[in-house]
UniProtKB/Swiss-Prot annotation:
Pfam families tied to this protein: DUF188 (PF02639)
PANTHER family associated with the record: UPF0178 PROTEIN YAII (PTHR35146:SF1)
InterPro entries: UPF0178
Protein name, as recorded: UPF0178 protein Sama_3557
Family note: Belongs to the UPF0178 family.
Organism per entry: Shewanella amazonensis (strain ATCC BAA-1098 / SB2B)
Length: 149
């Protein structure tokens, strides 16, 4: 059982939470990115560098993830794919994607993308807040608590 991280867009503060959890629970955290990612020396923290390209890191995560594992991503299409494989997906703001809610999130993402492309809506999400960080840590702790000791 391990945690996979879509590391290219994962905020540093969230990575730090994951690194502490990896050490505390002795669970493997693997960061997947198309650029070098600095990780602390630990037998529980790994990184995989993939080639640059559209969805290359996402495809690597989908290929490697197993049922019941956790994927950290803000990428809703990636969340949809890993959920289809029986994994769980958690975004850096603490929202747990499930089979019940991921399709609605995907539809909303596509709608917002259309609005941005037409010039009606601009900008992206607000910066990560302290409440977001706490919500992420709480969801991560809930997932970790379900693991066998």
């Amino acid at each position: 059982m391990q945690i996979w991280v879509d590391a290219d867009a994962c905020p540093s503060v969230i990575k730090e939470v994951l690194f502490r959890a990896a050490e505390r629970r002795q669970i493997t955290v693997t960061l997947v990115a198309n650029q070098s990612v600095r990780v602390p020396p630990s037998p529980f923290i790994k990184s995989i560098r993939v080639e640059s390209g559209f969805d290359v890191a996402d495809n690597e995560i989908v290929k490697r993830v197993s049922k019941g594992e956790l994927v950290i991503t803000a990428d809703i299409p990636l969340a949809d794919e890993v959920i289809a494989k029986g994994a769980l997906a958690l975004n850096p703001r603490g929202e747990l994607y499930t089979a019940e809610n991921v399709k609605a999130r995907l539809n909303m993402r596509d709608f917002m993308e259309t609005l941005r492309a037409s010039g009606i809506q601009s900008g992206g999400p607000a910066p990560l807040s302290q409440a977001d960080r706490q919500a992420f840590a709480n969801q991560l702790d809930r997932w970790l608590a379900r693991l066998p000791k």
